[in-house]
UniProtKB/Swiss-Prot annotation:
PANTHER family linked to this entry: N-ACETYLGLUTAMATE SYNTHASE (PTHR23342), N-ACETYLGLUTAMATE SYNTHASE, MITOCHONDRIAL (PTHR23342:SF0)
Catalysed reactions, as listed in the record: N-acetyl-L-glutamate + ATP = N-acetyl-L-glutamyl 5-phosphate + ADP
Localization per record: Cytoplasm
One annotated GO molecular function: acetylglutamate kinase activity
UniProt main location, coarse: cytoplasm
HAMAP family: ArgB
Gene3D superfamilies per the UniProt record, alphabetical: Acetylglutamate kinase-like (3.40.1160.10)
Protein name: Acetylglutamate kinase
Amino acid sequence: MSTNNSVLVLKVGGALLQCEMGMARLMDTAAAMIADGQQVLMVHGGGCLVDEQLAANGMETVKLEGLRVTPPEQMPIIAGALAGTSNKILQGAATKAGIVSVGMSLADGNTVSAKIKDERLGLVGEVSPKDATYLKFILSQGWMPICSSIAMMDDGQMLNVNADQAATVLAKLVGGKLVLLSDVSGVLDGKGQLIPSLNGKQIAELVKQGVIEKGMKVKVEAALEVAQWMGQAVQVASWRDASQLVALAKGEAVGTQIQP
């Protein structure tokens, strides 16, 4: 049986949910890895679905420095889109690929501690690792947890957590290898070329130049945080080429490596 050190933590973005072929390829790859004894934990966002649901309810999407602002009146819709629809779409794709999965959120199993991140962002949470028991049990059965980024404070208040940050915390919790998957192949330079490797100093310089901004800035900073915490590189790669994941599981580099 695999140990915690072999857990592959895959964070997938909302764009994947709109690409049936991409989901199928990714889940087929995950199924093959699980059959080979690799433990896989999936963490997801769902920004596109959230935007659609808010618009359908006559509400506006507001972002501050790349992070979604979550007013209290939007929380039920955001929770439904992430912990409900997005989670079950991914679970359906996993089931179709023959994976036994457990749909969950950050609020389940006493997994994380949650608090308000910044009052300016409304009900946006910041989480820290708490108890790995629930996740370890699911993984030990050869099942794949599919975790949404909805958390809960001790008083029962739901919070919306950035999915990259959620994946970072869960990777810390299980001592796993983190891969941030999006619809781009990695971090691109000012000319649109892939940057194979970056460290903290280089990231700071590219942020200053405006090359890394908005959503990618959040993604890269989350990757840098976990790389420094765990003392190992974190990958930023594309789900469009799921075969990259097999290479990654073998220890080969794909996408952009964020160095500690």
